[in-house]
């Protein structure tokens, strides 16, 4: 059984490496201990470092992704052979080799209510959808452009970057910046 949590979210990306804020109103039944968190993940998608975590309070949340770089163990080298981002299909080109970290969103029940994830609190990955696209957040340590088949082109500035990626016959990538979008978090059981 899947629960769908519609959110009204806005993101603000203030220039190169600027702070990214995702706010939302959650509808649906969510236990009081539920937190929404952003994690830097390994190249295989495993959570490595919790970057931000907030409780859902009164059906609302506000995630402010820090401007700081993820830890070195959360970073991987970005090159044409290891890009496994949404919408990327071979052939892939990367304008410069750089370090990167992808941010994925998870929920967990903060059973001891200490405000952070602990062993024994299972993480549940959630996909953040905006319209027909998916919210994709990635950090790079230098400016780089990634190109792939079907029109994929992402120009990344040093720091955190956020995009809406729509995959169809072509791949459409648009910056996730000032404004509002409808976002849905799908929580699998």
Label each residue range with its predicted role.
Residues 24, 52-67:
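Glycine-centered loop-to-beta-strand initiation motif
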Residues 64-77, 139-141:
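Short Pro-Gly-centered beta-turn/loop motif in secreted/extracellular proteins
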Residues 2-8:
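Sec-dependent signal peptide recognition
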Residues 29-44:
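Short, ordered, surface-exposed loop/turn motifs in non-cytosolic proteins
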Residues 20-29, 105:
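A short, amphipathic beta-strand motif
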Residues 110-122:
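Acidic, glycine-anchored loop motifs typical of Ca2+
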Residues 10-18:
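Hydrophobic h-region of N-terminal signal peptides that target proteins for export
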